[in-house]
């Protein structure tokens, strides 16, 4: 499916920049980062949040002629309350959970748009990232993840993956059956 190459998760935020405040790296900052990664031989990048930052990253790759491709995923937020999350005990109302699900739907739509407009750079799309663990802050029901996988496959024609820790995959067979690639996080210590 893909030629072998070095891969890295890319997030080029500088001090005072954050997706939470909608302050993103500039074109020149992204170019600086990708020039370094290109010199180090990285061919594949993984990013989340289908926003201007991802589009700008695609533009830099294209403008500079870097031999790089991007796996882009949505920045999903929780659609269920998770009392098992040790650092976020927020108890969202039904209305808030509905709004969060609508935001995730918009994120998937935006991901499809960006993947199609940058099909020369984006080689695969992800349903999400760590959205099922018992300790997770941004959990999404498996049925919704499956529907996202189907929408992404139909909407982009790109290989579809989901990024999750090694221990969660034993509970994700239904989702795995919908995917083209299984992306496993294997932390050395946790």
Walk through the language-model features, giving the residues of each.
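Hydrophobic faces of well-ordered beta-strands that scaffold small-molecule active sites
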Residues: 4-10, 45-47, 68-74, 123-127, ...
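Boundary/entry segment of secreted carbohydrate-active catalytic domains
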Residues: 1-33
């Amino acid at each position: 499916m893909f030629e072998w190459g070095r891969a890295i998760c890319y997030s080029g935020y500088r001090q005072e920049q954050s997706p939470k405040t909608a302050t993103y790296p500039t074109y020149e900052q992204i170019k600086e980062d990708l020039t370094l990664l290109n010199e180090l031989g990285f061919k594949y990048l993984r990013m989340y949040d289908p926003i201007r930052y991802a589009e700008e990253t695609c533009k830099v790759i294209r403008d500079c002629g870097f031999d790089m491709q991007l796996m882009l995923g949505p920045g999903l937020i929780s659609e269920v309350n998770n009392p098992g999350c040790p650092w976020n005990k927020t108890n969202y109302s039904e209305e808030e959970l509905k709004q969060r699900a609508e935001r995730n739907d918009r994120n998937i739509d935006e991901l499809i748009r960006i993947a199609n407009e940058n099909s020369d750079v984006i080689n695969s799309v992800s349903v999400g990232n760590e959205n099922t663990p018992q300790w997770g802050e941004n959990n999404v029901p498996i049925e919704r993840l499956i529907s996202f996988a189907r929408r992404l496959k139909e909407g982009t024609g790109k290989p579809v993956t989901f990024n999750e820790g090694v221990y969660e995959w034993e509970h994700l067979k239904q989702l795995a059956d919908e995917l083209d690639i299984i992306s496993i996080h294997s932390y050395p210590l946790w």
